[in-house]
Swiss-Prot record:
Belongs to the bacterial ribosomal protein bL12 family. One of its GO terms (cellular component) is cyanelle. It is found in: Plastid, Cyanelle. CDD domains: Ribosomal_L7_L12. GO terms for molecular function: mRNA binding; structural constituent of ribosome. The gene is rpl12. This is Large ribosomal subunit protein bL12c. GO terms for biological process: translation. It comes from Cyanophora paradoxa.
């Protein structure tokens, strides 16, 4: 890091909680961002399925479903969704959920992903 960033870091370390909260609010207003981004159920990332050098303008029809992380309080519910999606046994699904990030399904269609997204949204509400 540069000396300027080191100096800023040292100044930040000296802030009280109230000063830090005020700083966060000021940064949010100045840059138009929200520091309270939602942290919800299992984070799922859709990665394009491996399949050569397709044209970028062509719409993807198959995706790899990657499970990024699973909050401890949602593990059982995510495990059920993974089992229904992959037809794995309980032990295999548990190992997959605990070894994130992991590809859950390869070559999934958009419809499958929409259904999974719906299932995960329901998990977040429970």
């Amino acid at each position: 890091m540069s000396s300027k960033t080191d100096e800023i870091l040292e100044q930040l370390k000296g802030l009280t909680l109230i000063e830090a909260a005020d700083l966060v609010k000021a940064i949010e207003e100045a840059f138009g961002v929200d520091a309270s981004a939602p942290v919800g159920g299992g984070m799922v990332m859709m990665a394009p399925a491996a399949g050569g050098g397709a044209d970028a303008a062509e719409e993807k029809s198959a995706f790899d479903l990657v499970l990024e992380e699973v909050p401890a309080d949602k593990k059982i519910a995510v495990l059920k969704v993974v089992r229904s999606l992959t037809n794995l046994g309980l032990k295999e699904a548990k190992d997959l959920v605990e070894a994130t990030p992991k590809v859950v399904k390869e070559g999934a269609s958009k419809d499958e992903l929409k259904q999974l997204k719906k299932n995960l949204k329901q998990l977040e509400q429970k």
